[in-house]
C-alpha cells in the first residue's frame, strides 16, 4: 500500500512538473514569440516524460492546456500578442496557434519517447535503456538543430542583445529591455525602452552580432 501511494504521488508530481514546464514555454511564446526556445525545450522534456511516466505522460498535454488557459485568463492583456494593433479575434487566433504549436512539439516528443520505451523493453540492461532514451532525446532536437544550429542560441541571443544595450546606449537611462523572437525576420530582437518613453530596437545579424536597427 505504501509503495502504491508513493508511486501515485510520484506520478502526480511528475505530471504537474512536466505540465508546468509546458505552461512556462507557452508563456514565453505569448510574451516573446520565443519559438527557438520552445523547439529546444518541449520535445526533450516530452521524451523524458514518456520515459518516466509511460501511458500517464498523455496527461501532460491535457494539464498543460489547463494551465495555459488559466494563465491566459489571469494575464489578460499582459503579453506581447495583446500589444499588437489588431482585433480581438486575430489575437485569439494567434493565441490558439501558439498553443497548437506547443501541443505538436509535445506530441512529437511523446511519440519519440514511446518509440524509445518500445525499444528499451527488448533490452533488459538498464544502461542500454538509458542510452536509447538519450539517443531519442537527441533525435527530438533535430528540427531545432537544422533551423538554428546552436543549442545555446536562445540564451546567447538574449545575453548579447542585453549586454549590447547596456554598453552602447548611455545617453538616457534604460527603463526596460524586452527580448523577443521576430517571426517575420527569423531572428532575436530587443526593444529597449528608455526612461523618456522612447523605444530603440536592436537585432542580431546573420553572424550573431548585435546591432542597432
Stretch-by-stretch model annotation:
Residues 5-11, 100-128, 147:
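Membrane-water interface at the C-terminal end of transmembrane alpha helices
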Residues 7-24, 64-65:
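Alpha-helical transmembrane segments
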Residues 22-32, 73-86:
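Juxtamembrane "helix-exit" motif on the non-cytosolic side of transmembrane helices
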Residues 25, 40-64:
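Canonical alpha-helical transmembrane segments
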Residues 57-72, 132-133:
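Central hydrophobic cores of alpha-helical transmembrane segments
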Residues 124-149:
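Internal/C-terminal transmembrane anchor helices
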Residues 144-178:
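Short, non-transmembrane alpha-helical segments in secretory-pathway proteins
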Residues 171-206, 210-212:
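Exposed beta-strand-loop-beta-strand "reactive/processing" segments of non-cytosolic proteins
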Amino acid at each position: 500500500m505504501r509503495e502504491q501511494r508513493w508511486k501515485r504521488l510520484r506520478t502526480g508530481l511528475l505530471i504537474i512538473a512536466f505540465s508546468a514546464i509546458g505552461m512556462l514555454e507557452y508563456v514565453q511564446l505569448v510574451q516573446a514569440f520565443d519559438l527557438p526556445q520552445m523547439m529546444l525545450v518541449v520535445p526533450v522534456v516530452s521524451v523524458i516524460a514518456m520515459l518516466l511516466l509511460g501511458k500517464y505522460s498523455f496527461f501532460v498535454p491535457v494539464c498543460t492546456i489547463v494551465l495555459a488557459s488559466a494563465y491566459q485568463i489571469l494575464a489578460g492583456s499582459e503579453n506581447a500578442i495583446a500589444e499588437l494593433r489588431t482585433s480581438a479575434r486575430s489575437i485569439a487566433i494567434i493565441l490558439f496557434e501558439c498553443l497548437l504549436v506547443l501541443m505538436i512539439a509535445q506530441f512529437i516528443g511523446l511519440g519519440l519517447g514511446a518509440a524509445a520505451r518500445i525499444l528499451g523493453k527488448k533490452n533488459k540492461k538498464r544502461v542500454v535503456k538509458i542510452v536509447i532514451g538519450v539517443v531519442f532525446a537527441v533525435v527530438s532536437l533535430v528540427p531545432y538543430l537544422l533551423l538554428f544550429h546552436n543549442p545555446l542560441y536562445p540564451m546567447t541571443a538574449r545575453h548579447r542583445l542585453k549586454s549590447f544595450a547596456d554598453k552602447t546606449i548611455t545617453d538616457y537611462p534604460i527603463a526596460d529591455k524586452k527580448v523577443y523572437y521576430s517571426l517575420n525576420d527569423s531572428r532575436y530582437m530587443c526593444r529597449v525602452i528608455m526612461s523618456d518613453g522612447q523605444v530603440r530596437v536592436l537585432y542580431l545579424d546573420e553572424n550573431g552580432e548585435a546591432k542597432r536597427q
